[in-house]
């Protein structure tokens, strides 16, 4: 079991190495045990991660009980919710790469035999999974848990309620006192943001991927069921180390398709598309936007989840969690049940053993009673997005929108224009130079999209960007436009007053301009001299690829 760690614990030449370990309280028989690393995302930066320390402490004790020498190391986190709408949001997607680097460096640099990664906020999940795949030693992902819903009177709240309250204030639909009440009650506990936003989308999909245990990803952060997941995850990891089951044995093209099927079924975040493109690359597998679109067309939405729907992730957990979702998909032949999981059993065997609760619940619907017949993450292409774009259509009553472009080069100017009433029904807001290189860091545009919803324009105005969207975004939005503006993509050539059509039925994003005029604009285009970054952002800018390939940093 200690195939890797024996390099530092065995033989007389490793006496100095063992001396260092003795200072950490290890001795004698410990040196024959496997070294299991616990990557801890604990942080008091954000409620998403503030409850993780107790998870890490319990996991460390459980692993030791099962015969491991356990070593805890830290992984950083950026709070998307707190950095939203600020220059700090540029570091959010960058942190996915930093987290993966940290995990790979510690696991490989310290000759670990296994890995348990514990995370909470959005980029902890894809960053952790990419790190597990790069290290490719037996590993498992353990989620820190979801936050419980907040309440203001009878109204159920999430953090997105606060963002939308800002827009409501802009149209004088809410008083300052009411906004502050929403602010005070939106986040009542620790845990990741409580709708089917990015963190909960990714954690739910990790169950289908086979890298997290069934029913472990939807449990509220403060709860007994989370403690049970810790125990079973530790036991499963030791078994994987014993049997030599590695992440790349589990994460394959077929299991990634299972994960994306769950993303579609729960009405998940657009970020899942970006992250699974990167996860597939780390797994040495293949996934394209075309694959994502094919999955979308097959898989119905069977959960009416926030942000556009009614239910929180805690509601989904009470209704049977991801196993219940996967059971419904499996009945319709939409899950490949032969895929291996980190337990050593197939996903079909795991589903058979899983306890599925409340079959009468309306939180998870049978596929023949689906909320939508197809997934709501639509891949678009056209003369504005030669390499693709991703639209989220949950909660929309319109699938075709044509309107006049309002072009902005900064999120701040865009939000101010929306709140000042300068964006009207039918407009197409175009936010440019916010892609992987242009941001740099491809920041999320929750503030402008929430402002549109709060101003009553969620169904009647459209927002298009080469940046990203929060999992809390809903409305008529198109992101991940590739090529991005900063590399001369067509989105950089859009001008105020241009006419744009978003056709979700025909997967089209079209700028109404003749080819000659578009070519003339392209010939005249020059990159604006506005980018002035250094350090980590400069390194990211110089090495990052385009969003249609997962925005992977070299």
Curated annotation (Swiss-Prot):
Q: For binding Mg(2+), which residues are annotated in this chain's numbering? A: 80, 122-123, 444
Q: Which UniProt keywords apply?
A: 2Fe-2S, Amino-acid biosynthesis, Branched-chain amino acid biosynthesis, Iron, Iron-sulfur, Lyase, Magnesium, Metal-binding
- Identify the Pfam families for this entry: ILV_EDD_C, ILVD_EDD_N
Which residues are named in the active-site annotation?
470
Q: Does the keyword rRNA processing apply?
A: no
InterPro entries in the record, alphabetically? DHAD_IlvD/Edd, Dihydro-acid_dehy_C, DihydroxyA_deHydtase, DiOHA_6PGluconate_deHydtase_CS, ILV_EDD_C, ILV_EDD_N, IlvD/EDD_N
Q: What is any one GO biological process for this UniProt entry?
A: isoleucine biosynthetic process
Q: What is its EC number?
A: 4.2.1.9
Q: Which cofactor does it need?
A: [2Fe-2S] cluster; Mg(2+)
Q: Does the keyword Chaperone apply?
A: no
Q: Which reaction does it catalyse?
A: (2R)-2,3-dihydroxy-3-methylbutanoate = 3-methyl-2-oxobutanoate + H2O; (2R,3R)-2,3-dihydroxy-3-methylpentanoate = (S)-3-methyl-2-oxopentanoate + H2O
| Known pathway | Amino-acid biosynthesis; L-isoleucine biosynthesis; L-isoleucine from 2-oxobutanoate: step 3/4; Amino-acid biosynthesis; L-valine biosynthesis; L-valine from pyruvate: step 3/4
Cofactor detail note = Binds 1 [2Fe-2S] cluster per subunit. This cluster acts as a Lewis acid cofactor.
Matching NCBIfam families, A to Z?
ilvD, PRK00911.1
Cross-referenced HAMAP family: IlvD (MF_00012)
Q: Per its database record, what is this protein's job?
A: Functions in the biosynthesis of branched-chain amino acids. Catalyzes the dehydration of (2R,3R)-2,3-dihydroxy-3-methylpentanoate (2,3-dihydroxy-3-methylvalerate) into 2-oxo-3-methylpentanoate (2-oxo-3-methylvalerate) and of (2R)-2,3-dihydroxy-3-methylbutanoate (2,3-dihydroxyisovalerate) into 2-oxo-3-methylbutanoate (2-oxoisovalerate), the penultimate precursor to L-isoleucine and L-valine, respectively.
Q: What is this protein called?
A: Dihydroxy-acid dehydratase
Mind giving the lineage of the organism this protein is from?
Answer: Bacteria, Pseudomonadati, Pseudomonadota, Betaproteobacteria, Candidatus Tremblaya
């Amino acid at each position: 079991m200690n195939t890797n760690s024996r390099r530092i614990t065995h033989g007389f030449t490793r006496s100095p190495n063992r001396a260092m370990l003795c200072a950490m309280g290890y001795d004698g028989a410990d040196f024959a045990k496997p070294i299991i690393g616990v990557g801890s995302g604990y942080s008091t930066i954000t409620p998403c991660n503030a409850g993780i320390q107790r998870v890490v402490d319990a996991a460390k004790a459980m692993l030791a009980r099962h015969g491991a020498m356990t070593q805890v190391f830290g992984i950083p986190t950026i709070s998307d919710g707190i950095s939203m709408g600020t220059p700090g949001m540029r570091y959010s997607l960058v942190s996915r790469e930093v987290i993966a680097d940290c995990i790979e460096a510690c696991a490989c640099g310290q000759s670990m035999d296994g890995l348990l990664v514990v995370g909470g906020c959005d980029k902890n999940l894809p960053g952790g999974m990419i790190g597990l795949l790069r290290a490719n030693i037996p590993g498992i992902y353990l989620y820190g848990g979801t936050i419980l819903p907040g309440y203001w009177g009878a109204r159920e709240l999430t953090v997105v309620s606060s963002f939308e309250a800002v827009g409501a204030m802009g149209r004088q639909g809410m008083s300052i006192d009411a906004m502050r009440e929403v602010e005070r009650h939106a986040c009542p506990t620790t845990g990741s943001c409580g709708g089917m936003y990015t963190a909960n989308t990714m954690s739910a999909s990790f169950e289908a991927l086979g890298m997290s245990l069934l029913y472990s990803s939807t449990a509220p952060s403060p709860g007994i069921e989370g403690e049970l997941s810790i125990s079973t995850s530790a036991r499963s990891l030791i078994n994987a180390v014993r049997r030599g089951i590695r992440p790349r044995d589990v994460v394959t093209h077929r299991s990634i398709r299972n994960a994306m099927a769950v993303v579609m079924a729960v009405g998940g975040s657009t970020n899942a598309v970006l992250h699974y493109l990167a996860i597939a690359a780390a797994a040495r597998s293949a996934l394209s936007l075309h694959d994502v679109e094919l999955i979308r067309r097959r898989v119905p939405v069977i959960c009416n989840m926030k942000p556009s729907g009614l239910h929180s992730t805690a509601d989904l957990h009470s209704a049977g969690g991801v196993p219940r979702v996967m059971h419904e998909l499996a009945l319709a032949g939409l899950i490949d049940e032969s895929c291996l999981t980190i337990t050593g059993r197939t996903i079909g065997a795991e589903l058979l053993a899983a306890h599925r609760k409340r079959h009468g619940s309306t939180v998870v619907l049978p596929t023949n009673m689906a909320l939508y017949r197809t997934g709501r993450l639509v891949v678009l292409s056209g003369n504005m997005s030669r390499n693709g774009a991703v639209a989220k259509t949950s909660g929309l009553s319109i699938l075709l929108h044509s309107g006049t472009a309002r072009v902005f080069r900064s999120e701040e100017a865009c939000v101010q224009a929306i709140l000042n009433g300068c964006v009207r029904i039918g407009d197409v807001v175009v936010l440019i130079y916010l892609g992987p290189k242009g941001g740099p860091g491809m920041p999320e545009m929750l503030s402008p999209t929430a402002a549109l919803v709060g101003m009553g324009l969620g169904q009647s105005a459209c927002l298009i960007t080469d940046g990203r969207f929060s999992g809390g975004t809903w409305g008529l939005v198109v992101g991940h436009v590739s090529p991005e503006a900063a590399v001369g993509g067509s989105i950089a050539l859009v001008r105020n007053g241009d006419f744009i059509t978003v056709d979700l039925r025909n997967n089209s994003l079209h700028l109404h301009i003749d080819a000659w005029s578009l070519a003339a604009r392209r010939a005249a285009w020059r990159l604006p001299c506005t980018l002035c970054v250094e350090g980590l952002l400069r390194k990211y800018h110089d090495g990052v690829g385009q969003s249609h390939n997962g925005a992977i940093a070299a």
